[in-house]
């Protein structure tokens, strides 16, 4: 996060290239970078940590010495991200995927 509470962009040229390619190829794009950015910024630096595998010593059986993993999600984080994917499917009306959503 930046000092003003916005998420720091670490993707470089990847995101514009991804968006351009989707537009050129005429394929739908669920822009998860934008969706997750909005989620993380709404939660803020401290609350967004609850989505990831971040824990003190003894908190995770698989990481007895503690862990700071800003890439992989805890269950609650995975559920939130899956919800954003479902939201994108609905927004783009991606048939037949929409028929599998609740």
List PLM regions with ranges:
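Catalytic His-Asp segment of secreted/periplasmic serine-dependent ester chemistry enzymes
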Residues: 1-102
């Amino acid at each position: 996060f930046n000092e003003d509470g916005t998420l720091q962009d670490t993707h470089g040229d990847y995101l514009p290239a991804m968006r351009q390619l989707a537009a050129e190829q005429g394929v739908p794009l669920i822009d998860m970078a934008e969706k997750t950015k909005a989620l993380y910024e709404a939660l803020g630096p401290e609350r967004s940590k609850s989505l990831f595998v971040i824990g003190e010593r003894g908190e995770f059986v698989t990481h007895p010495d503690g862990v700071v993993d800003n890439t992989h999600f805890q269950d609650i984080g995975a559920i939130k991200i899956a919800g954003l994917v479902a939201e994108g499917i609905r927004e783009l009306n991606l048939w037949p995927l929409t028929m599998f959503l609740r």
